[in-house]
Amino acid sequence: MTNFINLITIARILLAPIIFLCLIFNNYLVCIILFFLAGLTDYFDGYLARKYNAESQIGEILDPIADKILIVFLLIGLSVELDSFLIAFLSSFIIAREIGIAALRDYSSRKNISDRTKVTYLAKIKTSLQLFSIGSYLFALTISFNLLILISDIFLIIATLITIYTGYEYTLNVFKK
């Protein structure tokens, strides 16, 4: 069962470049359907792992990586597709934070203080808000509703502020005495 659950997570990773290509080639309906499917894989891999007590170390590592890959592919795709400096600018903070946190997790693991970089509730909200923002942009593109793009910008700004704050929080936590 563990292997099957990990395959669900890997499917989400494989969906990221496909969704990106659908976005770049203006196939918004397929894009939003695949994005929804990616969201379902995120839900079901966690649900099945808990239900069947099949949580694994590789699954713990793959799941957040799959989220980050999906988010990065789509933020880059959206910044290109919408020709948006704002999305590109905010994405640079999100991507830099994710790289920094990966380095912090590696460092804390080597120092045997990995408990200091456990995922926080606010970090889960951050990921959810990032994904919601992306979904909102995709929906706006699908129905050609420009006002929703502005609303999505606001959600992404809030997500980025939380992203920066949680990065700061993790950094303080790792280097506290």
Question: Can you say where each PLM-predicted feature lies in the sequence?
Answer:
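Residue-level signature of the transmembrane alpha-helical core
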Residues: 10-13, 33-36, 65, 92-95, ...
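Core segments of transmembrane alpha-helices
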Residues: 11-17, 64-75, 97, 101-102, ...
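Membrane-helix interface segments
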Residues: 3, 26-30, 54-58, 83-87, ...
